[in-house]
Amino acid sequence: MGKLYVVPTPVGNLEDMTFRAIRILKEVDLILAEDTRTSGILLKHFEIKNVMQSHHKVNEHKTVESVVNRIKGGETVALISDAGTPGISDPGFLVVRECVRNGIEVQCLPGATAFVPALVASGLPNEKFCFEGFLPQKKGRMTRLKALAGERRTMVFYESPHRLVKALAQFTEHFGAGRQASVSREISKVHEETVRGTLTELIEHFTANEPRGEIVIVVAGIDD
């Protein structure tokens, strides 16, 4: 029986790619990629020529069974996403779950993810935190924010740049205008930036300065 490797890829700077990740991607029989065009650029940079197959949120329900069967047949497979660690707000959970259910060894390499550097750079308490990722856009969003209003741990969210100010305004309604928070964007890229302050101050900043790039919001938990 083969093995499934979950391989993180850089969220920005290609120098964040590990030697081990490169070696694994060169050795496996098949690479499952969220977007073969995006991953193709990465693989070409590191001279990785192995076969790629598309594996994303639209088709993963259909491809999981065939992938599991190939691993059962002795092939080694690597799972990558466009950036970061597969399964963290990206496709990956389904194939990992099915491999576990079928007794297939799953090995996840340590590596890049956007929320950890954003959390550390925020300056907010990080001994305990909760990762919320992307909140629902419509149904359930307000319910979830209401449930988090009493959360004591630091909270971490992903958001798109064009919805950032609206999201911060919603946070103000549920967490209070004076709640400390930070917004990190373009982690590990040329224009990386972290802005810290109260939710109101962040709204003012990003209303005046249109945000671009991938966004991580870190919000302090409620004080005792």
Predicted features by range, described:
Residues 1-57:
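Glycine-rich, flexible N-terminal cofactor/catalytic loop recognition
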Residues 3-4, 73-78, 154:
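Loop/turn-to-beta-strand initiation segments
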Residues 25-31, 103-107, 154-155:
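Short active-site oxyanion
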Residues 56, 64-113:
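Glycine/small-residue-rich loop that forms an oxyanion/phosphate-binding "nest" at active or ligand-binding sites
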